[in-house]
């Protein structure tokens, strides 16, 4: 049994982690923590997230020193802000824990990236070298030996799962950059109250145009430039990405289908559509990424959907943990 600590459990992704870990037959929750300054410290997780009432009624304990919680812990999930994960991950690693970080603090092996896109100076270049990028379907072998796993961002997960098989099969004309138009539910902005995320204010609107930090994450791990425009949708959760690409001359629809099938035939958390494209409602509350596509001449449109809190965060983190410790990838997820 893996003793498991969830840090930052009060947020939306944190609550999903609690759900997944609680029903995992090989994991035991030792504690749920929040920062010592959090207004949620001392509250029950089930008071903040009533879907957990009668299932997990543990308190959210304030954490100011990891030594209060790290002894005997095997696994730590960090559902914390980027700067917080940056500071906590090395401490838990030194304490002998395997760390799964849901923030962006260790996703890109380039210290200058964090100054430009995250606004802080990265102090641990050696950990950037060591961290395994947790795109579970593609990086499984690296995960098996890693002690620090950087769980990908929500948008990058869907984008890479859709595009990587086609790039690796050399089917795309990358002189025309793939264009990713992505829409996420409001939960992607976190649980903290903000006027812009309130019911009467939120609308379908692009944001972070040409400046969003997920663009370089996608491009770095694909090894190809992309144009990425995120949108905030007026619904609670889920991501839908419509990706427009140009195929190389002579590439057929059958070749696109074959590349996707070969990539995901034995990957249970990616579901491919033989016909049509996926709808968001079919992945909300589930750990899958659904992918469909259409071809017209040299033009390809791929649609990928996922739950941003599950396949885009908590479920993928647990999927990575399953791979790391040799369990079935879908353990506790489906």
Swiss-Prot record:
It is found in: Cytoplasm. Its EC number is 1.2.1.38. GO terms for biological process: L-arginine biosynthetic process. SUPFAM superfamilies: Glyceraldehyde-3-phosphate dehydrogenase-like, C-terminal domain (SSF55347), NAD(P)-binding Rossmann-fold domains (SSF51735). Pfam families: Semialdhyde_dh, Semialdhyde_dhC_1. One of its GO terms (molecular function) is NAD binding. It catalyses: N-acetyl-L-glutamate 5-semialdehyde + phosphate + NADP(+) = N-acetyl-L-glutamyl 5-phosphate + NADPH + H(+). It is an enzyme of class 1 (oxidoreductase). Keywords: Amino-acid biosynthesis, Arginine biosynthesis, Cytoplasm, NADP, Oxidoreductase. Its main location: cytoplasm. InterPro entries: AGPR_AS, AGPR_type-1, NAD(P)-bd_dom_sf, NAGSA_dehydrogenase, Semialdehyde_DH_NAD-bd. Disulfide bonds: none annotated. Pathway: Amino-acid biosynthesis; L-arginine biosynthesis; N(2)-acetyl-L-ornithine from L-glutamate: step 3/4. GO terms for cellular component: cytoplasm. The active site is at 154. Belongs to the NAGSA dehydrogenase family. Type 1 subfamily. PANTHER family: N-ACETYL-GAMMA-GLUTAMYL-PHOSPHATE REDUCTASE, CHLOROPLASTIC-RELATED, N-ACETYL-GAMMA-GLUTAMYL-PHOSPHATE REDUCTASE, CHLOROPLASTIC-RELATED-RELATED. Catalyzes the NADPH-dependent reduction of N-acetyl-5-glutamyl phosphate to yield N-acetyl-L-glutamate 5-semialdehyde. This is N-acetyl-gamma-glutamyl-phosphate reductase. It comes from Escherichia coli O157:H7.
